[in-house]
Design a protein with these regions (language model features):
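Multi-pass membrane proteins that catalyze or facilitate reactions on polyprenyl-/lipid-phosphate substrates
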Residues: 1-292
Length: 292
């Protein structure tokens, strides 16, 4: 991987990680359109550490409070009813599905799941799901003829069942094109949570999963150092951190007043375009993969 490639891929990772459009799909597509090799699951997992570091800093006060209260609640029963202590457990519970499924389907994730036809399919299908979830949320918030405004749930009303459902949605993002934030936010909206609550829990839930995935890939790369270019990968990770932080700040303001429909339309059009390019042999479904 060249330094120019790492710059572009770092920008793409930072720009797309927190938007409901799938960073893994965009990394894969960028490489395919540019005629580069697929950066691979290891590159994606490691650069995601950069964007996750942006989450740690942006939500540092919330995270510090949650971790502190959760840890102290292990020794102080009086703190176990505190919302922050509960949130600590809910993040752990919500992380179980992706941990289990990630290990079980690791070979498929780094192989067949990176087929661009599957990516196009998931871009469209999850775009439709996000659109439906967004529309339901808008109806609750706006009300309408013969329909009263409905109060949506906040994080204070998040339960273990909700956490597990969020977790299953997050696990779906193991497939390129699904989008971690898109799947979890859609799940949250369908469960009746506010946009901000769904997005905030989505970002918190991603922390252990992304850091664990990155650490796992780093261990694998250290044992097989020929699989990745360390210098460009670290450079891309740093770029992803700075760009990702700016995107989080913008996105959290955006969701408080705006609809997700621009992302829905973008996902569907991109998926259709991808099918057209593959169907007309302009692009191979395996474009960018090693040996293609």
């Amino acid at each position: 991987m060249s330094w120019f490639e790492s710059l572009i891929l770092g920008l793409v990772q930072g720009l797309t990680e927190f938007l409901p459009i799938s960073s893994s799909a965009h990394l894969r597509l960028t490489a395919a359109f540019a005629g580069w090799h697929d950066p691979g699951a290891a590159f994606t997992a490691i650069t995601q550490i950069g964007t996750e570091a942006a989450v740690l800093i942006y939500f540092r006060k919330d995270i510090a409070r949650i971790v502190s209260t959760w840890f102290r609640s292990l020794f102080n029963k009086g703190l176990r009813s505190e919302q922050d202590a509960k949130m600590g457990w809910l993040v752990i519970v919500g992380s179980i599905p992706i941990g289990v499924l990630g290990l079980v389907f690791k070979d498929a994730i780094v192989g067949p799941a990176r087929d661009l036809r599957l990516t196009a399919t998931t871009l469209i299908l999850m775009g439709i799901v996000l659109g439906v979830a967004d529309r339901l949320a808008a109806r609750d918030e706006e009300g309408g003829r013969h329909r009263a405004i409905r109060e949506r749930k906040t994080l204070q009303q998040l339960g273990v069942k909700d956490g597990l459902i969020f977790g299953v949605c997050q696990a779906m993002a193991l497939i390129p094109g699904v989008s971690r934030s898109g799947a979890t936010i859609s799940g949250g909206l369908l469960l009746g949570f506010t946009r901000e609550a769904a997005a905030r829990y989505s970002f918190l839930l991603a922390i252990p999963a992304v850091l664990a995935s990155g650490a796992f890939e780093i261990k694998d790369v250290v044992e097989n150092p020929g699989h990745i270019s360390w210098g460009p990968t670290i450079f891309a990770t740093v770029i992803a951190f700075f760009v990702g932080y700016a995107v989080i700040a913008w996105f959290m303001k955006f969701i408080s007043t705006k609809s997700f429909m621009p992302f829905v339309i973008y996902r569907i059009l991109l998926g259709i375009l991808l099918f057209v390019l593959i169907g007309t042999d302009v692009l191979s479904p395996h474009a960018g993969e090693s040996g293609s």
